[in-house]
């Protein structure tokens, strides 16, 4: 192969920089796990994991974009390379096989990818679209048949809570009577009692029980305690609201 051009050398330098960033972010995570007592907060770990994920994505995209160049390059030592003092580095540069552990990871990844491509039992795009149309409505209807937040499910209450084996030393109270009293005082509250897909066009239709006039008068608009932007940032990076 001819001497690399300046553009090719620039690509190699970019590869080196991305790999250095990935190595440093991994080393930072390992150091924080090994030396911190107690362990770092989950928000800190989430932030570090996000950085590592971004670095991995950057390396993957760069290697894919420059696949032809990187697969055609051949490394060899020049006459001026200090082979005696830098033997370990030279061995790594001239290595033609992956590390045994890495080779096993690559083999498993390729096997999993090939299995996914050969799987003919998967759903077609039309079937997936139909599934996603069906799932939200069915999940909503199933959720409304459950007793969320209680000690017993509706099925367990119907067959008798005294027959339920919980495996707990303490006895769980049946909150059914209390919830019935609460429901009597909340009959006039607005409640979504059903959901279904619209007959024409996209979207859903909800069946809503009307609220009383007194309830309408008492309703007041309340500003959210945490802005939506901070909530999304907290979900993706782990950063606490109000902190950047």
Curated annotation (Swiss-Prot):
One GO biological process term: regulation of transcription by RNA polymerase II
Keyword Coiled coil in annotation: yes
GO molecular function terms noted in the UniProt entry: RNA polymerase II cis-regulatory region sequence-specific DNA binding; transcription coregulator activity
Subunit organization: Component of the Mediator complex.
Record family assignment: Belongs to the Mediator complex subunit 8 family.
Protein name: Mediator of RNA polymerase II transcription subunit 8
Coiled coil, from the record: 6-30
Localization (cell): Nucleus
Main subcellular location: nucleus
Keywords (A to Z) from UniProt: Activator, Coiled coil, Nucleus, Transcription, Transcription regulation
GO cellular component: core mediator complex; mediator complex
Its biological purpose: Component of the Mediator complex, a coactivator involved in the regulated transcription of nearly all RNA polymerase II-dependent genes. Mediator functions as a bridge to convey information from gene-specific regulatory proteins to the basal RNA polymerase II transcription machinery. Mediator is recruited to promoters by direct interactions with regulatory proteins and serves as a scaffold for the assembly of a functional preinitiation complex with RNA polymerase II and the general transcription factors.
Alphabetized Pfam families for the sequence: Med8
